[in-house]
A protein has these predicted regions:
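A short, amphipathic edge element
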Residues: 64-81
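Core segments of small alpha/beta cavity-forming domains
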Residues: 1-67
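Generic alpha-helical secondary structure signal
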Residues: 28-29, 78, 102
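Short, charged/polar low-complexity linear motifs in solvent-exposed/disordered segments
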Residues: 58-61, 68-70, 88, 108-111
Length: 141
């Protein structure tokens, strides 16, 4: 599965680079749900990112059922860096909206729908091997 091009700013080992990478990850996560593709999320996930494993499982469920999500699943409302990074990890306070959405069958019929939800918490990226990886997204209602 081919990833969309990584924005130039997401290649920099700076807090701004980490933020650009997290935003890119959310774009890829949306793509993975709207045109269900396995293998996109793991290409960006660190070995310790449990939420990344959960997200790939959600995509796997869509693929298995032949379903897709109609609109982007995640929308970042706020992302603010927390202090300095330690051990190559840059953390952020995040607010994310999951807009009201529909899950569609392969034929385009509505399989299910859900109301909008706001989640918040921490996200983080870790710099390893000359690039960013998603460290963790711990976001809850």
């Amino acid at each position: 599965s081919a990833l969309p091009p990584l924005p130039e700013e997401a290649t920099e080992n700076t807090p701004e680079g980490a933020e650009a990478f997290i935003r890119y990850y959310v774009d890829v996560a949306n793509l993975a749900h709207q045109t269900p593709q396995l293998g996109l999320v793991p290409q960006l996930a660190s070995d310790v990112c449990e939420s990344c494993v959960t997200m790939e499982q959600q995509v796997s469920d869509l693929v298995a059922k032949g379903e897709r999500v109609e609109e982007p699943v995640y929308q970042i409302d706020k992302i603010e860096p927390i202090g300095g990074s330690t051990g190559g990890v840059q953390l952020f306070n995040m607010n994310v909206t999951l807009p009201a959405n529909r899950i569609l069958t392969a034929e385009g019929a509505e399989a299910s729908s859900y109301e909008a939800t706001e989640i918040s918490g921490r996200g983080g990226a870790i710099w390893e091997g000359d690039r960013w990886w998603v460290y963790e997204l711990t976001l809850t209602p």
